[in-house]
Amino acid sequence: MVLLYVPPVQNLLRREVTAYASKATGMQIQVERIDLRFPLNLLVRGVEVIQQPDTLLSLESLNVRVQAWPLIKGKVEVDEVTLSRVAVNSADLMEGMKIKGVLGRFFLQSHGVDLSNELAVINQVELSDTHMQLLMNDTTTTPKDTTASAPINWKVALHQLKLKNVSFSMQLPADSMRMTAHIGEAAINNAQADLKNQYYDLKKFLLSGTSASYDTGTAQPTEGFDASH
């Protein structure tokens, strides 16, 4: 176990694992650097997954810092999860849909996740310069799942959420429907969710520089209210 913290061993494992994964999947998988520091501080840089002619994933950096001792007590203390400059393209991996987009920066800090009591405190979440597209090629409905699911009793407290320059678009070519939404800036402070009792509240919600659009069909928009645009 101690050997995992030795840089030459980390480099050897990085080369062997990426070579095996590339051969097993038929993709070109590259990882520039993997750095694991004591006790649980993981840094990954320069990830690229290519399935010709598409680049399915490129990631500049991922940094995860988790406190080790609380895990023994069934608690999770996340000092940092940071993702920087990520690009995804599902290409033809998922039947009936395609996801493509970029993520500029994502940051999460969470102190107070109690697994046994189903409690979670999320101190800070930030997402910026992120733009995702969803293209649905098949609108066939799937049978409703009637299997009973286990009850969810989690209580979640979110102290601070910030969004900046975030957009999402969805297109259904079969019926020419297009939806887009862009958030210039948004912030949520002191939000709570009790999933068992379906109770939700928040103290502050701020939104600015935001737009949304909905279009269906190929006809040009008409003056006044137009339900298709």
Region locations from a protein language model:
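Intrinsically disordered, low-complexity segments enriched in small/polar residues
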Residues: 139-148
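Short aromatic-enriched loop/helix-cap "lid" or pocket-rim segments at secondary-structure transitions
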Residues: 137-140, 219
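Flexible beta-edge/linker motif
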Residues: 33-136, 151-171, 182, 187-216, ...
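N-terminal type II signal-anchor transmembrane helix
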Residues: 1-26
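Short, intrinsically disordered, charge-balanced linker/junction segments flanking boundaries
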Residues: 220-229
